[in-house]
Swiss-Prot record:
Keywords: Ribonucleoprotein, Ribosomal protein, RNA-binding, rRNA-binding
Subunit structure as annotated in this protein's UniProt entry: Part of the 30S ribosomal subunit. Contacts protein S5. The interaction surface between S4 and S5 is involved in control of translational fidelity.
Cross-referenced NCBIfam families: PRK05327.1 (NF003717), rpsD_bact (TIGR01017)
Lineage: Bacteria, Bacillati, Mycoplasmatota, Mycoplasmoidales, Mycoplasmoidaceae
Superkingdom assignment: Bacteria
Domain S4 RNA-binding, first and last residues per copy: 94-157
Gene name of the record: rpsD
Protein name: Small ribosomal subunit protein uS4
InterPro entries, A to Z: Ribosomal_uS4, Ribosomal_uS4_bac-type, Ribosomal_uS4_CS, Ribosomal_uS4_N, S4_RNA-bd, S4_RNA-bd_sf
Pfam families in the cross-refs: Ribosomal_S4, S4
Gene Ontology MF terms: rRNA binding; structural constituent of ribosome
UniProt record similarity statement: Belongs to the universal ribosomal protein uS4 family.
GO BP: ribosomal small subunit biogenesis; translation
Length: 202
């Protein structure tokens, strides 16, 4: 399964979940705030399998992953001590593209992924252009000096997440101070269903 590159608005409405994390897709000014298609406004009772699938898709589309990438990260979470459901979310948030977004350096996760892909990002003062790279606690994340003039970056004024320490606001330097707690992550995801899904397959 390839990574989804279609309309975020349509996918958010279908899942009933804001992939932009700001509910912009469901604003009352939008033409439609329900799922796309002829029967998009009908409520359907999902089976346990259907619920697992929806919750897995929420995380896959939120973090811009395909199934192979998600399985790999699930195995990483499985190998860590602690609660598997929280481990999974923490691993997802430890991806470089996610941290660039959480640091407030990009307006969306997609934009953050593009910044990493185009070699605008440094981790511990070394260029890293792999969005899926996992960043360890204590590592610094920064944008290259020449990248600071890019309009997308200059116009992004998002506040960093609480688990990100902003070292230099002007030069766009931050540090992953700690792993996030569950209450700092998307509330409208039931990650227990995702664990059930992969426990059944692996």
């Amino acid at each position: 399964m390839s990574r989804y590159t279609g309309s975020i608005y349509k996918k958010s409405r279908r899942l009933g979940f804001s992939l932009l994390e700001n509910n912009k897709e469901f604003n009352s000014g939008k033409k439609r705030t329900y799922g796309p298609g002829q029967h998009g406004n009908k409520k359907v009772k999902l089976s346990n399998y259907g619920q697992q699938l929806v919750e897995k898709q929420k995380l896959m589309f939120l973090y811009g992953l395909n199934d192979r990438q998600f399985r790999r990260l699930y195995r990483v979470a499985l190998g860590r001590p602690g609660v598997l459901t929280l481990n999974l979310l923490q691993v997802l948030e430890s991806r470089l593209d996610s941290l660039v977004y959480r640091a407030g350096f990009a307006p969306t996760r997609r934009a953050a992924r593009q910044l990493v892909n185009h070699s605008h990002v440094l981790v511990n003062n070394k260029k890293v252009n792999i969005p899926s790279a996992l960043v360890e606690v204590g590592s610094t994340i920064a944008l290259k000096a020449k990248s600071l003039e890019i309009p997308l970056i200059k116009n992004t004024l998002n506040k960093p997440a609480d688990f990100i320490e902003l070292i230099d606001k002007e030069k766009k330097v931050a540090k992953l101070a700690r792993l996030p707690e569950r209450n700092e992550l998307p509330a409208d995801v039931n990650e227990a269903y995702v664990v059930e899904w992969y426990n059944r397959l692996m």
